[in-house]
Amino acid sequence: MLSPSMVPRSEGIDVASVSLGAHHGALLSRAGQVFTWGCADHGRLGHGSQHHISAPLRVEALAGMRAAQVACGDLQTAAVTEDGQLFVWGCAPTHAAVYVARSLA
């Protein structure tokens, strides 16, 4: 059994909530910023790269917006802004790319 451990380089982030997918995670800061880390396959991290990220990295495509919620699926991530906009990035279960409102992958 694994024991709990701190996510690397997350100490400076005031975390409001977290969501975990099959091989990636997303967190929402109290300032409304979205951070993702883990397996980047299928664009699920929203950083425009397929490289694994070992520590939370801010999703720059959402800069200037305040997110209110974040959620992870197996191959996708979603965020809802405080003004009700929905952003989804990654891959649908059919392995088709998913882009709602704005491309982040």
Short names for language-model regions:
Residues M1-A105:
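Eukaryote-biased RCC1-like beta-propeller repeat architecture
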